[in-house]
UniProtKB/Swiss-Prot annotation:
It comes from Homo sapiens (Human). The gene is CUX2. Residues 127-149, 845-854, 1266-1276, 1320-1334 have a biased composition (Basic and acidic residues). CDD domains: homeodomain. The lineage of its organism: Eukaryota, Metazoa, Chordata, Craniata, Vertebrata. The keyword Nucleotide-binding does not apply. This is Homeobox protein cut-like 2. Residues 114-167, 415-481, 517-549, 661-690, 716-758, 800-858, 964-1032, 1231-1453 are annotated as: Disordered.
């Protein structure tokens, strides 16, 4: 036993239980880790299996399934095995891990065993048993191993089995306890960690807060320190200041002390001297003392006198101030009064305009009827006897006799009233009256027998006119010519018809039903007629009178009735719209289909219904319209007419008219067989020059007649029509109206008829040149007088009149035959419809050219159209030549890809910078809207009608350049041709030349360049002409823009700004001269440039220009030069060194302007100053010499001169223009001075020798007389007024004075106001800015008259047509010389304007026109007021001044006669030259 125990003890001693337990622990942890891993992998495996099932197709799954299943079984088996092994291990582990070490127990057991060993006797059994029991009692002493093995340390093996079961339970219990403890420990640790983390976070936040607080406090500290430093510094400064102040104060105090001491000393010395003086006897020193004593009183006296003087001066100052205030107040009051008057008058004008607008339709109906009658009469009386119906003639004469007073009534107010009133109004009247029969004064018109005799006024009536003078102004606001409105309207139409067919057509009473009552009343009463008839007449609105407008019309009913009538008579809406409403077919259709109720209509909207009502009121109207319709359908002629016939006709008509005008002036000499009209005028017979001219014109007329018999019918009647005005009160009315109206009339007549009988081909250019030579030689220098109105008239008559013969015809048919085209006074007629009609006429009626033959006068009517200058003409509906049948066939039935076609067209348009409007007008014959629509949304070819396909066919033809309209050629054609030929006075190319011009290639390109507003034309081209030629021609710049690579707009603008600021150049100057933009636009561009890709073609242009400018090495110098020139020009203007007119500061001056006429849009941009071209003295000398040799230089001469003098050709041309006109003015002035001496009694024709018959020294064929001009001028310059003044009356002296002034101005002007190329207007002229651009669509029209047709213009300067002289005497009364000069200046400006117009270039005669509009009207009228009134004083300035005081003052009739003649001839020549000039072919084409 002992051995047993010992061996056990040894065994357990060797056995390291603790190490074993540790190893078991580590293995257990490994196992648990592995178990987790295996769980994860198991899960992963399951997921993979699912994915595999999802993703793998079934076939594969079936193939792989057995492998997978076996694999799965393996895995499952493995996992089971490992779990079992783990479980076994764990069970062992659980038993061993907590087992106590048995070694100590064994040791104790052994020791006991040893103690018990010796007694080997039996009784030992008892203690053993006890021990056994003690073991039993303390089973926990047994080691688990023993328990497991069933051994007990001492007891017998029997008991072991019973002890074993309790041991594993205890082990489990201890294990769970241990686990719990660990878990609790871990929890504790986690909680500790969490709390630590939380605390740490809080601590960090606190640290951050502290950091930010620290920073804030640091910043505050710094701020405080800074403030402290500042305060310290300021305190230091203050202290320093205080110290310096103290020092200064100390110094002052010391100085004061010193002064005080010195004063004390002086006082003491004075006192002592006084004492001495008192005490001591007068000795030699006494005088001195006296002196010192006296000096005091003397000083006081001096001071007192000074005080008195100061007081006196103060009083003077106060007095002056009060007088100044009074003056200011007075002037302010005057200004206010004038403003009030102005507003009153403008209101009156507005009212009148409204009335006119409201009442236009009546006239139109009248015209239709007149046409009808004319046609009937024409057909019935082919022989056209001139004195056809005596009673009618007598009626006419009665009317004529009646009209002078009327006319004077009408005129006076317009002359006296302020120039604001719409001059077009009295023009029109004058035209209507004066042109037809320049009514002889009643005294001279013996009232012929006839039923209407009562109408002819008694001889006393003419006095009415003058007596009216003073009231005129007052009553003006009512209506400038109401009396006329009623009376004349009543009477003129019949008169009008007389021209039409040679006899009178008095309309049926129904037509004039409303009028007769008012008529008789008109002539008799004095001033009342001005206001009187108007109420009765309603200002003339149609037969219905004013009531018609006020009453509520049933629009639906009217529309219904109109439709009914149109259907019944088979009249088309287009014709109805054109002739009756002045509207397009679309508008008519809209109005008739959906008439709005009356109350919802605007004033303008009511007009068509009023017109329709008036149209319906008389069956005659409907019949007339039907006739027109029938005739229209009957004759469809091509719209484009050969230039030949056009210009020939024009020439013919001009000459015809000229003849007529001369007759009218010679009034006394009966011209035709119409006896009643040829009543002697009471004036002396015309001079020989007049006869000569007359004979030339007669001869021309005969030649023309030989060429075209057909025109005879038309010529007979109109020729006898005019009787000259004799009353001196209206001297110039005659010219204005006669010249203007008949001119137009005749011209229209000419152009109206031609289509039907084409002239035999004769080169018009040659023919006209010869006539011009003759006329010029006859006219002498005096003949170029009235360019202005000539030009205006020309322009007026042209835009429609000559723009297309077809138009003329159409318009003529539209405007009955009042010979002057306006039998109705302007007063009761709205300007709009007529213009519309004109436009429409142009559009619609070209076909009717043929039929008009019968109505010569009808045609004239058309000519008159343009007299509604205040109205901006609608652009003509584009008319394009019809497609030829071949072209139709070629394309009509061939499939076309419209999308591709429109794309190509758009590309070509963009590339060539052609705008859609031009393209539409010139190529497709469509409006811009239609073109835009067609290009953006082309319909497929299959869906297009035949008409719808036409535009696409045209596009194809255009793309393949088979269409005449050379839209694309802009740059070449537009630049070259218009400028050169037009401006050169050399004979124009013969009309037979390029026929293609008839297709308006040129106009097209011109317009397109206009359209795109090539600013560079005006802008970049240098002002001085030479200066800035960098810019491209309009087409050019656009191509550059189209081709230009992407530019960095930002950097460009940045550079431009830098260059401008570095060189102190203003944005305005830069914008105007380089970009052609206003200062605002430039500022906007430079401050906010858009990126290149967002800009349109147009928007890119300024940037391309900037880039070009930046690349130009001389850009800054050029701008500086411009700036200097501007300054110079400004100073000259400012200090009166130069006449306003001559500053070429207007668009015109851009000599380099590539496109000959600026676009209307440009003009608005271009209202900027531009430096004049200043010529050096030697250049002027050279030019003068050249002038002596050739006043009308040929193109070669011009080019040679420009090359030699290094000037631009434009400059040379303009210099010649200016110089010629200057010479003419001087001749005129001389003439006016001489005239009183030569012909005090006043034969109209006796011209001072040398004026009308200059000695025929050899000269250039064009102007045989011009050569004398220089000599005249030199004489005048040398001798000056002295020579003249001796024989002169005071009047004449005044004129001389003016003349000198002119000469100075001229010298200035010569120095360089070469208007460059397109209309020059001075800044001073306000509105006239719009001058040159022709209204769109009238490209080829004369561009001479700057304003009249322009959009803005409320009135053309032609208004000044007011009787020329009268207006000068009465209206332009500038009581002070200054204003007088200003008048001359402003008018001069207009003179120059016309100079530069291309047409002017070709017709030198123009240059001189003088329509004396008062300068006062300058600001108001849209175009320069007139040509130089001051230069050609009608009477003398003094007379003018007197006129100011006596409105009815009269002008010397002889003078007037002479002026009228000159104006006439001037006008004739101008128009003849225009007609001959092939460049103007466009006028006749459309």
């Amino acid at each position: 036993m002992a051995a047993n125990v010992g061996s056990m003890f040894q065994y357990w001693k060797r056995f390291d239980l603790r190490r074993l337990q540790k190893e078991l622990n580590s293995v257990a942890s490994e196992l648990s880790a592995r178990q987790e891993e295996s769980e994860h992998s198991h899960k992963h495996l399951i997921e993979l299996r699912r994915e595999f099932k999802k993703n793998v197709p079934e076939e594969i799954r079936e193939m792989v399934a057995p492998v997978l299943k076996s694999f799965q079984a393996e895995v499952v088996a493995l996992s089971k095995r490992s779990q079992e092994a783990e479980a076994a291990f764990l069970s062992v582990y659980k038993q061993l891990i907590e087992a106590p070490d048995p070694v100590p127990v064994f040791e104790a057991a052994r020791s006991l065993d040893d103690r018990l060993q010796p007694p080997s006797f039996d009784p030992s059994g008892q203690p053993r048993r006890d021990l056994h029991t003690s073991w039993k009692r303390n089973p926990e002493l047994l080691s688990p191993k023993e328990q497991r093995e069933g051994t007990s340390p001492a007891g017998p093996t029997l008991t072991e089995g019973s002890r074993l079961p309790g041991i594993p339970g205890k082990a489990l219990l201890t294990e769970t306890l241990l686990q719990r403890n660990e878990a609790e420990k871990q929890k504790g640790l986690q909680e500790v960690q969490i709390t630590l983390a939380a605390r740490l976070g809080e601590a960090e936040e606190k640290i951050k807060v502290l950091h930010s607080a620290l920073k804030a406090t640091q910043a505050e500290l710094l701020e405080l320190r800074r403030k402290y430093d500042e305060e310290a510094a300021s305190k230091a400064d203050e202290v320093g200041l205080i110290m310096t102040n103290l020092e200064k104060a100390n110094q002052r105090a010391e100085a004061a002390q010193r002064e005080v001491e010195s004063l004390r000393e002086q006082l003491a010395s004075v006192n002592s001297s006084i004492r001495l003086a008192c005490c001591s006897p007068q000795g030699p020193s006494g005088d001195k003392v006296n002196f010192t004593l006296c000096s005091g009183p003397r000083l006081e006296a001096a001071l007192a006198s000074k005080d008195r003087e100061i007081l006196r001066l103060l009083k003077d100052v106060q007095h002056l101030q009060s007088s100044l205030q009074e003056l200011e107040e007075a002037s302010a009051n005057q200004i206010a009064d004038l403003e009030r008057q102005l507003t009153a008058k403008s209101e009156a004008i507005e009212k009148l305009e409204e009335k006119l607008q409201a009442q236009s339709d009546y006239e139109e109906i009248k015209t239709e009827l007149s046409i009808l009658k004319a046609m009937k009469l024409a057909s019935s009386t082919c022989s056209l006897p001139q004195g056809m119906a005596k009673p009618e003639d007598s009626l006419l004469i009665a009317k004529e006799a009646f009209f002078p007073t009327q006319k004077f009534l009408l005129e006076k107010p317009s002359l006296l009233a302020s120039p604001e009133e719409d001059p077009s109004e009295d023009d029109s009247i004058k035209d209507s009256l004066g042109t037809e029969q320049s009514y002889p004064s009643p005294q001279q018109l013996p009232p012929p027998p006839g039923p209407e005799d009562p109408l002819s006024p008694s001889p006393g009536q003419p006095l009415l006119g003058p007596s009216l003078g003073p009231d005129g102004t007052r009553t003006f606001s009512l209506s400038p010519f109401p009396s006329l409105a009623s009376g004349e309207r009543l009477m003129m139409p019949p008169a009008a018809f007389k021209g039409e067919a040679g006899g009178l057509l008095v309309f049926p009473p129904a037509f004039y039903g409303a009028k007769p009552p008012t008529a008789p009343a008109t002539p008799a009463p004095g001033p009342e007629p001005l206001g009187g008839p108007e109420p009765a007449d309603g200002g003339g609105g149609g037969a219905a009178g004013p009531g018609a407008e006020e009453e509520q019309l049933d629009t639906a009913e009217i529309a219904f009735q109109v439709k009914e009538q149109l259907l019944k008579h088979n009249i088309g809406q287009r014709v109805f719209g054109h002739y009756v409403l002045g509207l397009s077919q679309g508008s008519v259709s809209e109005i008739l289909a959906r008439p709005k109720p009356w109350r919802k209509l605007t004033v303008k909207g009511k007009e068509p219904f009023i017109k329709m009502k008036q149209f319906l009121s008389d069956e005659q109207n409907v019949l007339a319209l039907r006739t027109i319709q029938v005739r229209q359908r009957g004759s469809i002629t091509p719209r484009i007419r050969t230039p030949e016939t056009g210009s020939d006709d024009a020439i013919k008509s001009i000459l015809e008219q000229a003849k007529k005008e001369i007759e009218s002036q010679k009034g006394g000499e009966p011209k035709t067989s119409v006896a009643p009209l040829s009543i002697a005028n009471g004036t002396t017979p015309a001079s020989t020059s007049e006869d000569a001219i007359k004979s030339i014109l007669e001869q021309a007329r005969r030649e023309m007649q030989a060429q075209q018999q057909a025109l005879l019918e038309m010529e007979v009647a109109p020729r006898g029509r005019s009787v000259p005005p004799s009353p001196p009160e209206r001297p110039s009315l005659a010219t204005a109206s006669q010249n203007g109206a008949p001119a137009l009339v005749k011209q229209e007549e000419g152009s109206g008829g031609p289509a039907q009988a084409p002239l035999p081909v004769l080169s018009p250019a040659a023919f006209v040149q010869s006539i011009i030579r003759k006329v010029k030689s006859e006219i002498g220098d005096a003949g170029y007088f009235d360019h202005h109105w000539a030009s205006d008239r020309g322009l007026l008559s042209r835009p429609y009149a000559s723009v297309s013969p077809s138009l003329s015809s159409s318009s003529s048919s539209g405007y009955s035959g009042q010979p002057n085209g306006r039998a109705w006074p302007r007063g009761d007629e709205a300007p709009v419809p007529p213009e519309d009609e004109a436009a429409a006429g142009a559009e619609d009626e070209p076909p009717r050219t043929g039929e008009l033959k019968a109505e010569g006068a009808t045609a004239e009517a058309g000519a008159r159209l343009p007299y509604y200058p205040a109205y901006v003409p609608r652009t003509l509906k584009p008319t394009v030549p019809p497609l030829t049948p071949e072209q139709y066939e070629l394309y009509m039935y061939r499939e076309v890809d419209t999308l591709e076609l429109t794309r190509q067209v758009k590309e070509k348009l963009a590339k060539n910078g052609i705008c859609q409007r031009i393209f539409g007008e010139k190529v497709l014959g469509l409006s811009q809207g239609s073109v835009s629509d067609m290009l953006s949304r082309p319909k497929p070819w299959s869906k297009l009608t035949q008409k719808g396909r036409e535009p696409f066919i045209r596009m194809q033809l255009w793309l393949s350049d088979q269409l005449g309209q050379a839209v694309g050629q802009q740059p070449g054609a537009s630049q070259a041709s218009p400028t050169e030929p037009r401006s050169s006075p050399s004979p124009p190319p013969s009309p037979t030349e390029p026929e293609k011009s008839s297709q308006e290639p040129l106009s097209l390109s011109l317009e397109s360049s206009k359209e795109n507003q090539q600013p560079e034309g005006r802008s970049s081209s240098s002002l001085s002409g030479k200066m800035y030629s960098g810019s491209q021609a309009p087409g050019g710049i656009q191509e550059i823009v189209a081709m230009s690579p992407e530019l960095d707009t930002y950097s460009i603008t940045k550079r431009v700004k830098e260059v401008l600021t570095d060189n102190n150049l203003g944005q305005r100057l830069f914008g105007e001269s380089i970009l052609g933009l206003t200062q605002g636009s430039v500022s906007d561009l430079l401050s906010r440039p858009k990126p290149w890709h967002k800009l349109s073609l147009k928007g890119r242009e300024p940037f391309v220009r900037m880039q070009l400018w930046l690349n130009d090495p001389h850009n800054v110098e050029k701008l500086r030069d411009m700036k200097k020139l501007e300054k110079k020009a400004y100073l000259k203007r400012r200090y009166g060194l130069i006449s306003t007119g001559s500053d070429s500061e207007s668009p015109a001056t851009r000599s380099e302007c590539p496109s000959p006429c600026l676009q209307p849009q440009d003009l608005s941009l271009l209202q900027i100053k531009k430096p004049r071209v200043v010529l050096a003295p030697e250049e002027k000398e050279a030019l003068r010499k050249a002038y002596q040799l050739e006043p009308y230089p040929s193109q070669q001469t011009i080019e040679l001169l420009s090359f030699q003098l290094n000037l631009k050709t434009n400059t040379v041309i303009n210099w010649f223009h200016n110089y010629r006109s200057r010479m003419r003015r001087e001749m005129l002035v001389e003439g006016t001075q001489d005239e009183p001496d030569l012909d005090p009694s006043g034969g109209p024709g006796i011209l001072p020798p040398g004026h009308s018959h200059p000695d025929p020294t050899p000269q250039s064929p064009d102007s045989e007389t011009e050569d004398q001009k220089p000599t005249v001028k030199e004489l005048e310059l040398q001798e000056g007024p002295e020579e003249n003044s001796t024989p002169l009356t005071t009047q004449d002296k005044a004129q001389v004075r003016i003349k000198q002034e002119q000469m100075e101005e001229d010298a200035e002007e010569e120095a360089g106001s070469q208007p460059q190329d397109s209309g020059e207007l001075d800044k001073g002229q306000g509105p006239p800015k719009e001058e040159h651009p022709d209204p769109p669509g009238n490209d080829g029209l004369p561009k001479v008259a700057p304003g009249p047709l322009l959009p803005g213009g409320s009135t053309p300067d032609c208004p000044s047509l007011h009787p020329q002289q009268e207006s000068e005497a009465g209206e332009r009364l500038h009581p002070d010389p200054l204003s007088f000069k200003s008048a001359s200046e402003s008018s001069r400006c207009s003179l120059e304007v016309s100079l530069n117009s291309p047409s002017a270039a070709s017709s030198p005669g123009l240059m001189m026109s003088v329509s004396p509009v008062p300068s006062s009207s300058a600001p108001i009228s849209p175009s320069p007021p007139g040509a130089p009134p001051a230069k050609v004083p009608s009477a003398s300035p003094t007379a003018d001044m007197a006129g100011a005081l006596h409105p009815s003052a009269k002008v010397n009739p002889n003078l007037q006669r002479r002026h009228e003649k000159m104006a006439n001839l001037n006008n004739i020549i101008y128009r003849v030259e225009r007609a001959a000039n092939r460049e103007e072919a466009l006028e006749w084409e459309f």
